[in-house]
UniProtKB/Swiss-Prot annotation:
One of its GO terms (biological process) is sorocarp development. Residues 1-33 are annotated as: Disordered. Belongs to the hssA/B family. It holds the Pfam family Coiled. InterPro entries: HssA/B-like_chaperone, HssA/B-related. The lineage of its organism: Eukaryota, Amoebozoa, Evosea, Eumycetozoa, Dictyostelia. It comes from Dictyostelium discoideum. Signal peptide: none annotated. This is HssA/B-like protein 47.
Length: 97
């Protein structure tokens, strides 16, 4: 289980207005073959919880939570539909898989 937090000034894609928020930024993996990523990496569309806080939380076995990079739809490996989906996460390819 990995956990990291970050505070960043991000642009919220829901309102298209910049705001400095404390992103929850929890990249948490709860299944053995999942890849948790996200948290303060641009806001995304709220991840699977729809909070708009860059939450990358994986509760589904085998799925990959894209977190701030677009959000997982809850299925196994479903791509996010946010502005950051398919891109990189803080410069690393964890969300581009």
């Amino acid at each position: 289980m990995t956990l990291f937090s970050s505070i960043s000034s991000i642009s919220n894609p829901m309102t298209s207005s910049k705001s400095s928020i404390a992103s929850f930024g929890s990249g948490t993996s709860m299944s053995s073959n999942s890849n948790a990523c996200g948290g303060g990496c641009g806001g995304g569309n709220g991840g699977i919880l729809g909070l708009g806080l860059g939450l990358g939380l994986n509760l589904f076995g085998g799925s990959r939570s894209r977190g701030a990079c677009g959000g997982n739809n809850g299925g196994s490996g479903n791509p996010g539909n946010g502005p950051f989906s398919g891109g990189s996460c803080c410069g690393s390819p964890c969300c581009g898989i």
